[in-house]
Amino acid sequence: MNLYRRYGWELTLAALLVLEILLFGLSNSRMLDINVLLFSTSDFICIGIVALPLTMVIVSGGIDISFGSTIGLCAIFLGIVFQAGVPMSVAIPLTVLIGALCGLINAGLILYTGVNPLVITLGTLYLFGGSALLLSGLSGATGYEGIGGFPAAFTDFANQTLFGLPIPLVIFMLCVLLFWLLMHRTHSGRHVFLIGQSSRVARYSALPIARTLCMLYAMTGVASAIAAILLVSYFGSARSDLGASFLMPAITAVVLGGANIYGGSGSILGTALAVLLVGYLQQGLQMIGTPNQISSALSGALLILVVVGRSISLHRHLIYEWLQRRRSRKASA
């Protein structure tokens, strides 16, 4: 009972995930093939890698909508640096540093200006996206082809397996463990929750707000860089638009996973399960031949239904009290 009270929403998401797979399996038996389930994650798991630190950002009361552009910038930067003759062993760490720098720029602007993070990261979304397009144009890379010619060892990396699991899925699982420990088992994680619940109280309590926010946005930038590296390896080319479609699925996963968009509460495990739930929903709809437009609409409907259901669950005692009062009035009348 205590386990359900503590992880009730996560268990609900896990049950929905199993139900979803079984329902799609009735329409297409391939959905029940364990190899299909494992290897199809490579198509969407990079969204999860970015959604994990984004969960911590949202729990802190902030938001970062620039990560899609950061992915594109890091991807094209990796291609240009490699094109310039820099070894991949050097180009990859440099790309991660660029991602961290993008995150620190976001944090610095938010802390210095005091402007809402949504406005700041909307600006950097265009800044990083424009920079990616500029670099792409200077390198002569076309929109759909991008920069190719990477070593086989690099392009094979994202398509290899470890213990029978695709490498991107293994990296995602490691990220889930890392961010779960950071958020739920460290002082920094407690600071994140406290800042999200009340930044004013956190400031009066002398919590390291600036340092914590810098860490969160930098981690989101690093995760974006890692996602960019995996995507370049998976597709075999570096393009400025690689992260263009990541924004809504990632935020959907965070909210669906149980994070309060206003801050103060959230779950890394919930986000991880929501990533799989949304990802397999898209995969299953494609397998049964559903058009992309309908697929997107159904994803939005799922989010609304689940969020409404969660809201009812959280406030069920208030609903029960209201029903009791209404019955009392009818009885007295």
Swiss-Prot record:
The chain crosses the membrane at residues 7-27, 45-65, 67-87, 90-110, 118-138, 162-182, 212-232, 240-260, 261-281, 288-308. Its main location: membrane. It is found in: Cell inner membrane. It comes from the Bacteria. GO terms for cellular component: plasma membrane. Keywords: Cell inner membrane, Cell membrane, Membrane, Transmembrane, Transmembrane helix, Transport. It is a multi-pass membrane protein. One of its GO terms (molecular function) is transmembrane transporter activity. Belongs to the binding-protein-dependent transport system permease family. AraH/RbsC subfamily. NCBIfam families: PRK15038.1. Part of the ABC transporter complex LsrABCD involved in autoinducer 2 (AI-2) import. Probably responsible for the translocation of the substrate across the membrane. The complex is composed of two ATP-binding proteins (LsrA), two transmembrane proteins (LsrC and LsrD) and a solute-binding protein (LsrB). This is Autoinducer 2 import system permease protein LsrD. The gene is lsrD.
